């Protein structure tokens, strides 16, 4: 399965009206890019040299050898230059090669190929002392065919691109540069080469993981990581990765990071100041990835031939109450370009979908009672509050709000867990295991007559709303007592609510 043409850059899988991700198959899946054909060390970045050095080609069993490249020169040597040596800048990376090392020769790589495969090539060429000429040859190793001839002066790099379809029966293809002529006539001088690409189209594979892997609770943080690997042969240009914040969660500010690959490190949430940002309006994180990526556009992701690990990004979300009892689903997408053809080809990739189950909301019950339903001003009333965690999960952050109404004065409080603050009316219970009950006893004095309603409201981090129970005490005025005792208010009371 190959990457698809981009219709809507940055577009992700659709979301249903219930907020669930309508996941689509991962495209392409790992190993789904077909045969990868790519040069090794196309920009001559290895081995690292200081100014210039002549090193053995890849046919030598020598740690100093140049990876990937071979030469027809009888001495088997390849010349590498560091950018800026003799005031000659590289065109790609920090190093480049000189085709004429100690003699006129051909530089090449032989690659396994499948007949019918479309390959793309790109190169940079420059003269050393003046105008130098070389030929690009592609074909079977015993008889490569000249595809193009390039002549460039020594003041700027020339850039060339093209396409090649592997003919029937050709299972090994040679990609070669043959020195034709060089200014000055010295066989050891001429024809600089850099930024060479030859291979299949880019093919970015996105692999997504969610940490932790198992069930989470409301309030937990999920870390999403997305790895992007270019399993094609050519580089993926203008790489843009996007990921919608899933329903039932909220983005954790400041959590954008490039874990590994180009431009690794933490990124700000704001747009236009580094290679990533969080778009609060659309609820989406955006990463510009690859070498040369900026705040405005994506960069270049090399083939896994040169960048085996690709690049990995990370961001975090917090599970909200709306996510309780459901699966938090997430899927990332990417857009990128194949810029090696006659016209740029816009491609898309989709990651695998992750699904993180969230525990259901905790059910609390609260019961409020009083030791009497009628009392006189000046008498004490004892209130009892019981809160129970009915499950199905443990509860955290359990609190009960029980503010004494006007007409009652707080005397004392005792509880089996946490403490009660009479100033705020808050009983901080804390964590409760499934099936646990905690109680609070409040002693209050009646200070004025009337119907005194006292309510207790319980909540927890995992509940979907508060639960309340209340009790009403009928407070009557305190009647004066006759001089010798007895009578209304002294032995049985009279009047009432």
Question: What residue spans do the PLM features occupy?
Answer:
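Beta-strand-rich interaction surfaces with strong enrichment in secreted/lumenal proteins
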Residues: 96-98, 107-111, 147-152, 161-164, ...
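Sequence/structural signature of outer-membrane beta-barrel proteins
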Residues: 145-146, 160, 182-184, 339, ...
